[in-house]
């Protein structure tokens, strides 16, 4: 690499590149010293040769004066974070190298203390539960969420989403908080759901600012909205803020759909409009929380990728995301035209015409084509908020609304066997991410595979299409689809998944923080699934992905939750190759079957808590 090429790079990345290509004589960490340690063995040489010298030469210590300490926010590292803040319209940005799970916990730990009230989106990722409810002794007021048929995660329900209702709930729980202008210290919201619904940030900022000091938008599954004109009001960081508005924090998983290495994340802070107010979160307080959660031995190329992401988006963000938006639309159109059982999740007809009959240019600029309220009847959901759109950069395909019902896990495995990796799948949905680097060749390969699965695989033996399964299914692929669907129907799996998130069915026994303390202290009992109803959970229980808590720590296990996880248990035993992963439940082998158990508060401990 010559000097002219390096000059085109942003400062931190340019310095790291210079460092990596110069001969070094390190006596500091990391101990592999540019790969020299590995190269002492045959296996190590294979390792370094495959990954290339740059990967090892770029792994340097923060003892190096040229590059400095990335956690200090000074020098070249500070310049990189400042570039990101300018690019994404933040007052200040923190680079986080351990994922948005850590970013969320940093923000919650900086803002919340014992006794606070928090408005809490029930769709939040488990890291929000951990940071807000398990680590901080706060009281949540949950916001109702939507589940569509097929297990598809919608946004917030319009039910109960009124200031008066939320203020009344705060008064019921903590009357003393009503003396404050804002009864809630923080609102924790998902800007974009895993299944591709994105919230109108402007609406939620206006709605919740009279109630909350701060709003934390988890934008792990977004980050590009400010570069797409269609989503102009959906970016929390580009909205004009008044002194009456809440302070804004936004966390982004740069590695998901932006241009970052795995684990890269960033926190954006925008609150200069309340800097002289009592509720203001000083940068030093957030930085203190940041330093509690990060490593003092960062991998510098991760930091560099965050700077490069900011650089690329500052120069060409809108152009690049126009390309991704166009790709997402064209790919959906082709799937609609060539597939019969697998179809994109879309509103359907617009003004009496099929969605795919419109010009791509129209679809790119008109929100009617992404309005998911039009799907309410078809998808079996009520109380849909008008303040969400289908995310145009997430291609969510349904597998239960076409000619034949197909379990999405079966389709996912088929595609992965052909080196096509979906982001995730639910019961009847499968997600593909649209990004600026995607090509028509990739889309064509995907569409061909989808079409082949529908037309050429159903009558083939399972062992021919899926030769590496853990057990033998002596049937055709079509018959296997029918068998799995029968299991789903027998357990009313779709209805159970929807009911799992109805708030009226949930009862809190103790706080999440207290549940965690009991779990750590040994005040716990491992109980089989069938005996869980009415017991207080000590761990958050969920299916993963997406990592949304079905039962939160401190809540009582309901009959619905027990029935839902009983279905998952049966799924694991009947079709182990296709069953989802459980988190917060523990598998034991009993008489040749897998049984689910969960940690709960012992009954004697419950009596003691009541007496106190």
Stretch-by-stretch model annotation:
Residues 44-55, 96-108, 166-178, 380-384, ...:
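Short, composition-biased local secondary-structure segments
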Residues 55-102:
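Conserved N-terminal alpha-helix of the aminotransferase class I/II PLP-enzyme fold
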Residues 86, 100-113, 117-336:
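Conserved PLP-enzyme active-site core in the AAT-like
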Residues 89-91, 113-114, 183, 201-202, ...:
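Short, well-ordered loop/turn elements at secondary-structure boundaries
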Residues 94, 141-143, 423:
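General small-molecule cofactor/ligand-binding pocket signal
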Residues 94-96, 187-190, 430-435:
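Short glycine-rich or small-residue beta-strand-to-loop segments that form or flank ligand, phosphate
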